[in-house]
């Protein structure tokens, strides 16, 4: 980077953050993000992960810089804080309209706006469970038919950044495997990964780029000898004795249960004390974090959620023995900025269940000595090797998103589906989180003793609280409720419903949550419900749209989208445009035309694609073919007409229901997704001059033949799963945009 560009980048960073960048950050802006970046705790990893990429994307080398940055963090609280910080940077730089910013963590992960603008430069900040599950085509708190869109975008034109590697667990190996599979199988546009670490370099990631910037602050190491039989009480007394009046003491414990107990003991002793962990509603979490910034003479008791990214420093740190990388992160919260020139104290103890012997030996050898961040970073402590991530065969098996049971919803709305029965080949939990880290999302509402009312809104946004699945599963039967995906009614959750990312309701009168303590399953105190927020205004199609018009408009949108995205080979570009032009041919089927006209006055003649929503909601209708999928008919027409297999697949896949495996739903057999063998379709003539004659549909051999053809596309070396999903995404986005041309607020909902 020339001196002029270096000065320009310094101005860029100062405008965003108010601080001058460290030299290593300027180097990243000049050379691009490396594979591995090692920076001491407090050395500016977040700035290094975001602003050099942003500068290269918008200023110096946009054509060589992936258009999406995905910043993956291990905790919801860290993701929230980072999301706010990055938003402030974009606002100060005047880029909020040019660069999208989205949060993929907790309940916010269900917001899918980032999928609708694949051509826009964007930043996704998320937790590893929500992001990696989507990269494996099994997104937590996501709707299965939307999975190919998330997958296609995350594996295309994306710069991944994984922070705090020591907290990723199995997700670290998964992230490495996914990058290697992208390199091996190919993507539509370059996709890269940077891993950042504050400690030693993980094996197999190559040579690290070393960053510096953290002050050479001092911490003195000392051991606390606590009796295992009275551990919590002794630890509480030790914290009280170690606290220096007028300063902050930070206590990091390995167990949420022990953190609750020590917090309660300190509070009972009259100490000013805050409890921080991962299981708070958003507003309460933000309030507590703000309280830590405004106080100095207090104690913060935390779980390992504090290790990563939280901008918090204390004069005294009390920590349980933990793996070395975690210990280094925790020590980084002691005298973090050198605000105590005399140094801080790191006091460690062995929990009742024991700890890592190698870490204990290093700490014992440095008893009473002052250590710096550089010494901690340079230490060589052997740590367990994480289990391997998914292989090629696993990745290919996950590409099939067909439900393994008949319980998924067939609605095209973006809502939760009922649980699928996953086979070992397609379950992804083991590649993402330790079992103890899996969470569901819970909201508390007040309702009648019989349960939630039929019109009770779905939980969303600020009222949702992540809850450990293990503790949720211990609640009495009938405590948790969810909306059934098939009939839309609230019902008690079954054990199979308690899955990562599930959205559940609990009765506020039964307790389980305290605003200053978060998820507290043994608390009987009624929970003050958090406002669910205003319901979204109802939108829908406000005019009749003919089939020919919709197909042409979708092809037009595909042209526009392709013009704004990286150059694809001509054959793939043509396949996307043709699939967009043909995707809804199956709407010519009588079952769909009858559905569009049913209950609506004065429908026009001719084949329709969209119906006009009037001033009043329609009465409920019972479809004669409840599982009907028009895109299956599109596939049958194109296949029988001898069209290109890729075009046929992309047209069929445009709602995410007809992709690899196609089977009857519920009790509909011998129908197949609402289509009967021998059904007739009328002739279709498009304004382009293309004609599709009337046909008799045959479905007897379709499922097996279709799966074989779809798998051949997935396994084609010139396509592969990543490119194929990206092409699916382009057709779907073009369809959404053409439909949006005719959408508006429905007056009856205002």
Question: What kind of region is each of these model predictions?
Answer:
Residues 358, 364-365, 567-750:
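Divalent metal-dependent catalytic cores for phosphoryl transfer on phosphate-bearing substrates
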Residues 190-192, 196-244:
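Interdomain hinge/linker at the junction between the two RecA-like core domains of SF2 helicases
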Residues 2-38:
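Conserved pre-motif I regulatory segment
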Residues 129-133, 138-188:
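SF2 helicase catalytic motif II
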Residues 237-244, 261-271, 275-290, 294, ...:
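C-terminal helicase lobe and adjacent C-terminal extensions/tails of nucleic-acid helicase motors
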Residues 65-89, 108, 129-130, 256:
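Conserved Walker A/P-loop ATP-binding site and its immediately adjacent core
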């Amino acid at each position: 980077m020339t001196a002029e560009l270096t000065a320009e980048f310094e101005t860029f960073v100062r405008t965003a953050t108010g601080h001058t960048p460290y030299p290593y950050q300027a180097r990243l802006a000049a050379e691009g993000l490396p594979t591995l970046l090692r920076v001491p705790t407090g050395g500016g990893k977040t700035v290094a992960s975001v602003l050099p990429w942003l500068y290269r994307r918008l200023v110096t080398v946009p054509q060589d810089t992936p258009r999406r940055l995905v910043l993956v963090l291990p905790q919801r609280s860290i993701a929230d804080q980072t999301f706010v910080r990055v938003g402030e940077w974009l606002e100060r730089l005047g880029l909020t309209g040019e660069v999208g910013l989205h949060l993929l963590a907790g309940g916010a992960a269900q917001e899918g706006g980032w999928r609708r603008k694949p051509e826009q430069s964007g930043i996704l900040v998320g937790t590893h469970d929500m992001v990696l599950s989507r990269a494996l085509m099994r997104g937590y708190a996501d709707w299965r038919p939307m999975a190919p869109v998330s997958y296609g975008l995350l594996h295309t034109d994306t710069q991944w950044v994984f922070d705090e590697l020591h907290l990723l667990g199995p997700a670290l190996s998964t992230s490495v495997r996914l990058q290697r599979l992208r390199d091996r199988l190919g993507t539509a546009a370059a996709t890269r990964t940077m891993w950042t670490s504050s400690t030693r370099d993980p094996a197999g990631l190559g040579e690290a780029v070393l960053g510096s910037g953290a002050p050479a602050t001092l911490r003195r190491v000392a051991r606390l000898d606590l009796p295992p039989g009275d551990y919590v009480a002794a630890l509480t007394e030790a914290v009280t004795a170690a606290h220096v009046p007028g300063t902050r003491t930070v206590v990091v414990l390995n167990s949420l249960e022990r953190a609750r107990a020590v917090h309660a003991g300190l509070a009972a002793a009259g100490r000013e004390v805050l409890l921080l962990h991962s299981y708070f509603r958003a507003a309460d979490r933000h309030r507590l974090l703000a309280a830590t910034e405004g106080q100095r003479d207090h104690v913060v008791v935390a779980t390992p959620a504090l290790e990563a990214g939280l901008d918090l420093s204390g004069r005294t740190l009390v920590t349980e023995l933990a793996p070395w990388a975690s210990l280094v992160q925790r020590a980084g919260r002691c005298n973090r900025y050198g605000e105590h020139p005399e140094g801080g104290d790191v006091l460690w103890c062995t929990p009742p269940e024991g700890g890592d012997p190698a870490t204990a030996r290093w700490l014992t050898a440095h008893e009473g000595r002052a250590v710096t961040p550089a010494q901690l970073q340079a230490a060589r402590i052997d740590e367990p090797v994480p289990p391997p991530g998914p292989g090629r065969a696993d990745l290919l098996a996950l590409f099939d998103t067909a439900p393994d049971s008949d319980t998924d919803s067939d609605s095209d709305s973006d809502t939760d589906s009922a649980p699928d029965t996953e086979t070992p080949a397609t379950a992804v939990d083991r590649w993402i989180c330790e079992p103890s880290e899996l969470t569901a999302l819970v909201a508390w509402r007040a309702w009648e003793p019989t349960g939630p009312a039929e019109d009770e809104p779905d939980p969303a946004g600020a009222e949702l609280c992540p809850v450990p699945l293990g503790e949720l599963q211990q609640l009495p039967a009938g405590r948790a409720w969810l909306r059934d995906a098939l009939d839309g009614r609230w019902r008690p959750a079954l054990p199979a419903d308690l899955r990562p990312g599930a959205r559940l309701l609990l009765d506020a009168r039964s307790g389980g949550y305290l605003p200053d303590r978060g998820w507290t399953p043994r608390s009987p105190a009624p929970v003050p419900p958090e406002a669910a927020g205003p319901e979204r205004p109802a939108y829908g199609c406000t005019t009749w749209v003919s089939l020919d018009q919709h197909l042409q408009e979708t092809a037009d949108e595909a042209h526009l989208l392709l013009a704004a995205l990286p150059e694809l080979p001509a054959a793939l570009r043509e396949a996307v445009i043709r699939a967009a032009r043909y995707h809804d041919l199956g709407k010519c089927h009588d079952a769909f035309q009858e559905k569009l006209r049913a209950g609506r006055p004065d429908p026009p003649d001719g084949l329709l694609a969209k119906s006009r929503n009037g001033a009043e909601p329609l009465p409920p209708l019972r479809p004669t073919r409840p599982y009907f999928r028009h895109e299956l008919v599109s596939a049958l027409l194109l296949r029988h007409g001898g069209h290109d297999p890729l075009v046929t697949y992309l047209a069929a896949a445009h709602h995410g229901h007809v992709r690899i495996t196609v089977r009857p739903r519920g009790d509909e057999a011998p129908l197949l997704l609402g289509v009967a063998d021998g059904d007739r379709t009328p002739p279709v003539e498009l304004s382009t001059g293309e004609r599709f004659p009337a046909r008799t549909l045959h479905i007897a051999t379709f499922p097996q033949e279709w799966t074989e053809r779809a798998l051949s596309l997935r396994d084609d070396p010139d396509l592969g799963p990543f490119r194929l999903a990206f092409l699916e995404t382009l057709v779907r986005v073009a369809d959404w945009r053409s439909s949006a041309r005719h959408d508006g607020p429905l007056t009856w909902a205002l």
